[in-house]
UniProtKB/Swiss-Prot annotation:
Misc: This protein is encoded on Rac prophage.
Keywords carried by this UniProt record: Cell cycle, Cell division
Taxonomic path: Bacteria, Pseudomonadati, Pseudomonadota, Gammaproteobacteria, Enterobacterales
General function of this protein: Causes inhibition of cell division. At high levels of expression, can also abolish the rod shape of the cells. Division inhibition by KilR can be relieved by overexpression of the cell division protein FtsZ.
The keyword Hydrolase belongs to this UniProt entry's keyword annotation: no
Protein's recorded name: Killing protein KilR
Length: 73
């Protein structure tokens, strides 16, 4: 879970960029790649790597209203 965020919002899968914090099935992930041709958003956390094919993705928002970016590992 991220420390500070200002709510969540659902945005189209194509608009998610690598590094965005994503909420999927109650767990927090980081978007790693967005393959628009295959219609897959690849996500990861410390223990899991998977992909999402949903059209709308829930992201955490920062104080500026934009998706929160992860720090590089």
């Amino acid at each position: 879970m991220i420390a500070h965020h200002f709510g969540t919002d659902e945005i189209p899968r194509q608009c998610v960029t690598p590094g965005d914090y994503v909420l999927h099935e109650g767990r927090t992930y980081i978007a790693s790649a967005n393959n628009i041709k295959k219609r897959k958003l690849y996500i990861r956390n410390l223990t899991t790597k998977t992909f999402i094919t949903d059209r709308m993705i829930k992201v955490f928002l920062g104080r500026d209203g934009l998706p929160v970016k992860a720090e590089s590992w």
